[in-house]
Amino acid sequence: MKVTLIAILTCAAVLVLHTTAAEELEAESQLMEVGMPDTELAAVDEERLFECSVSCEIEKEDNKDCKKKKCKGGWKCKFNMCVKV
């Protein structure tokens, strides 16, 4: 009985490790593919650039000092653009 239980648990552990390794390889292969732009990330970058520059332009029109919009997540506002820190 103990031997059967040990064998089942061993097989389950091997299966979990194999599945995890396969998922990691799949993720790495997707990241390593050349020529596939990450459209979601590009859209976020463009959105941050747009938000920061538009925010400053609106404040300038109201004759106020341009208080740059805070960029979050490792980005900062510089020259009316969000740039990666």
UniProtKB/Swiss-Prot annotation:
GO terms for cellular component: extracellular region; host cell postsynaptic membrane
Main subcellular localisation: secreted
Keyword set, alphabetical order: Disulfide bond, Neurotoxin, Postsynaptic neurotoxin, Secreted, Signal, Toxin
Pfam families the record matches: Toxin_20
Keyword Disulfide bond in record: yes
Prodomain residues: 23-48
Cysteine pairs bridged by disulfides in the record: C52-C66, C56-C77, C71-C82
Keyword Hydrolase belongs to the record: no
Location of this chain's protein in the cell: Secreted
Entry comment describing in which tissues the protein is expressed: Expressed by the venom gland.
GO molecular function per UniProt: toxin activity
Span of the signal peptide: 1-22
Function of the molecule: Postsynaptic neurotoxin.
Family: Belongs to the neurotoxin 12 (Hwtx-2) family. 02 (Hwtx-2) subfamily.
Name under which the protein is recorded: U4-theraphotoxin-Hhn1g
Source organism of this protein record: Cyriopagopus hainanus
